[in-house]
A protein has these predicted regions:
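Domain-scale signature associated with acetyltransferase and cell-envelope carbohydrate enzymes
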Residues: 1-139, 159-161, 167-173, 178, ...
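A contiguous binding-surface segment within folded domains or other stable secondary-structure elements
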Residues: 136-153, 161
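Glycine-rich GHKL/ HATPase_c ATP-binding element in histidine kinases
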Residues: 186, 197
Length: 225
């Protein structure tokens, strides 16, 4: 049965999108709005929810996840690698984390651009009107707990209207507040709560306040011309 499902998955990605969407909703139980779209990508979480006008670009891999949710008018650009470690398996890894969820939740009007790696062993929650910009950022929710010598994971949260610069690293347990910017090549390794700040450095800290009337923070359409 597993081999049959794998064959179906492989065949489906080459079908015209209207037919492909019908198969994904009927066979896998996915909830995909009629105006949403997935291009040539291997996107097979346990559950997929795509809002109106959301889209996933080509050559995206999203596997071993409990859930992927894209809000309306949100997008995942090409060549993003999105992985996790689903719950409910017989593996000893993360067995002590009973409330863990392997999921990517993206709000409305948000964008993950190109060539990023998102490790969703624990949840990654990205708010509304967020941009994960540039290339080669890594959002890593799991690592090794040196003290206990075992795999451990913690969620990552990116607040509404935040902007994540290129080639950043965000570790499990980190939180970027709403209305904030994470500077390029920065390392975010803890939870912050002060809004309207530029966070930058290795490790990142608040380095400069940002104008609250910045147009990026007040827009009502996610797409930026």
């Amino acid at each position: 049965m597993r081999f049959v499902r794998l064959l179906i998955k492989a065949a489906v990605i080459f079908l015209p999108w209207p037919l492909r969407r019908r198969i994904l909703t009927a066979t896998f139980g996915y909830q995909i709005h009629p105006s949403a779209r997935i291009r040539l990508s291997w996107v097979y979480p346990r559950m997929l929810v795509m809002g109106a006008h959301s889209k996933i670009g080509p050559f995206v891999v999203a596997v071993n996840l409990d859930l992927v949710t894209l809000g309306h008018h949100s997008s995942i650009g090409r060549r993003n690698w999105i992985t996790g470690f689903p719950t409910g398996t017989s593996s000893p890894h993360f067995a002590d984390q009973l409330d863990r969820r392997s999921e990517l939740i993206v709000g409305d009007h948000s964008a993950i651009t190109k060539n990023h790696h998102l490790d969703c062993t624990s949840s990654i929650v990205i708010g509304n009107f967020v941009t994960i910009a540039g290339y080669h950022s890594q959002l890593l929710t799991h690592s090794v707990d040196i003290a206990d010598c075992r795999q451990a994971s913690s969620p990552i949260t990116i607040g509404d209207y935040s902007f994540v610069g290129t080639k950043t690293v965000i570790l499990g347990g980190a939180s970027l507040p709403a209305y904030s910017v994470l500077g390029a090549s920065s390392l975010l390794n803890k939870a912050f709560d002060q809004t309207y700040q530029l966070y930058a450095g290795v490790p990142a800290n608040a380095v400069k306040p940002l104008p609250e009337d910045s147009k990026y923070f007040t827009r009502d359409v996610g797409f930026i011309v």
